[in-house]
Amino acid sequence: KTGDEALLLARIAPTLVCRDRPAGARWFEAMSDPPSLIIMDDGLQNPSIAKMLRIAVVDARRGIGNGLVIPAGPLRAPLETQLEIVDLIILNAGPFDAGRSETDDTPGPDVQADLVAFFRDRGFRKPILRGGIAPRNDLAALRGQPVLAYAGIGHPERFFNTLRFGGVEVVETVTYKDHHLF
């Protein structure tokens, strides 16, 4: 039994869902053709596996929220602790589109620059990269077509804007809770 994210990832790479992270890593290592790289989601707080590279992906629109730890805020550990162990930060923006619409939630360059300054002010001197989501060519068949878009993800506007950026005519949106069972 697993969630939708693992099933989507399994379409493009060997994927394992395992509560016991070290056991999962050993499973990959025991494969006849083991991967040279293992990517863990939410692995920063797990000290049981040695890591070669720790990457923090930060939503460029939301930043770090109120800066507090769960349940008072969105962080899983204090920011100072995370910045000490992270090797690289990626500011994840929405679709790259110079002509954003008024409803697009993609942060402009000034918002991303503010985040870079924010992390630099806290002593983070390692690389900070800017990334984003770009639609794949699969959207070609939908371009110019009226579409009802529905999503059961944490921040559905980013998905809807990706469709719009890809040329899809989104006439209506329906939003469900994150990980909704369709």
Give short role names for the model-derived ranges.
Residues 31, 99, 121-122, 127, ...:
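Generic signature of intrinsically disordered, low-complexity segments enriched in small/polar residues
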Residues 45, 62-63, 136, 154-156:
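Short, solvent-exposed loop/turn segments at secondary-structure junctions
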